């Protein structure tokens, strides 16, 4: 029997699978005091977005696996895990469709001015009909940065569903689907795209990938969507561009820092939609991710090979 620490809330199917396998499950509910206390003798950690630095992992003397609830693993110290024989797994494909749908929804909601018009209707009545018109997405150019699992779903929705021209920037791929354009110069994508959407991992290379200089390349009518990781965008530069009319709007499911400060300008700008890292949060996705994350723990503790192993 092993001890499993779950740092944040997950769909109950995962903990049920762990308990059925004979393990003891401890819930921390994002309480860092509980996490620091319980990780000391934990055999496994199931984590969502709580940071697991080497200083914390080093206290976990029995740790055999860190099972990530999701696919982004920038909150886990991989170097420590590699050097100490701790397995690290992700849940590939489990939430990619939900995240892609969220990104697509942000695009449409911004393009059609849904939120400001709805708010105005409540405040001033039918005169809200005179709000500045939205735009059609059909026929526009999408700039897709990162064509992994999520990016491929977004590509399909925009190209096949909305007849958009899609430009892809991803230095790690060699081929793109027929009818899609691949560019090797990110600046070219930013200059040409009507909507730029980010679907890349957070690495040293992608941190502040979208900085002040690159934001300045974008059309003033363009929209920026980020459902990847907050630090990929220089948030101060983004706010400045939005406030000064150099960018038409932004849809952000992730921010830097996270959560957003209550007094952040992002909450005050009418051309910004901010959601609380909510893109993966669907009934279907939550079920799949929790199940796979738990199955990975059970597999490693049973001496079997898990899915989505990165360490």
PLM ranges: what are they?
Residues 82, 89-101, 116, 258-311:
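C-terminal helix-to-coil terminal segments
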Residues 1-89, 191, 211-213, 217:
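An N-terminal-biased, well-structured beta-alpha scaffold segment characteristic
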Residues 23, 86, 180-181, 271-272:
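Short, conserved active-site loop motifs that form the nucleotide-linked donor/cofactor pocket
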């Amino acid at each position: 029997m092993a001890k499993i620490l779950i740092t944040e809330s997950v769909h109950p199917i995962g903990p049920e699978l762990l308990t059925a396998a004979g393990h003891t499950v401890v819930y921390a509910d994002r309480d860092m005091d509980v996490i620091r206390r319980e990780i000391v003798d934990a055999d496994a950690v199931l984590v969502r977005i709580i940071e697991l630095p080497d200083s914390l992992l080093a206290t976990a003397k029995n740790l055999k696996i860190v099972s990530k609830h999701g696919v982004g693993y920038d909150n886990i110290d991989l170097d420590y895990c590699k050097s100490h024989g701790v397995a690290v797994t992700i849940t590939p494909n489990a939430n990619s469709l939900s995240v892609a749908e969220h990104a697509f929804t942000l695009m449409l909601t911004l393009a059609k001015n849904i939120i400001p018009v709805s708010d105005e209707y409540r405040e001033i009545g039918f005169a809200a009909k005179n709000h500045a018109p939205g735009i059609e997405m059909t026929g526009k150019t999408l700039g897709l940065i990162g064509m992994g699992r999520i990016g491929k779903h977004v590509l399909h929705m925009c190209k096949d569903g909305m007849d958009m021209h899609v430009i892809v920037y991803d230095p790690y791929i060699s081929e793109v689907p027929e009818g899609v354009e691949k560019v090797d110069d990110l600046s070219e994508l930013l200059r040409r795209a009507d909507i730029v959407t980010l679907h890349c991992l957070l690495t040293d290379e992608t941190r502040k990938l979208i900085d002040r200089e690159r934001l300045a390349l974008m059309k003033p009518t363009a929209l920026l969507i980020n459902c990847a990781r907050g630090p990929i965008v220089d948030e101060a530069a983004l706010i400045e561009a939005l406030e000064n009319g150099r960018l038409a709007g932004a849809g952000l499911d992730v921010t830097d820092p996270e959560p957003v400060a209550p007094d952040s300008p992002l909450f005050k700008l009418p051309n910004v939609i901010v959601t609380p890292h909510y893109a993966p949060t669907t009934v279907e996705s939550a079920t799949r991710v929790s199940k796979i994350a738990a199955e990975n723990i059970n597999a490693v503790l049973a001496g079997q090979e898990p899915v989505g192993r990165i360490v």
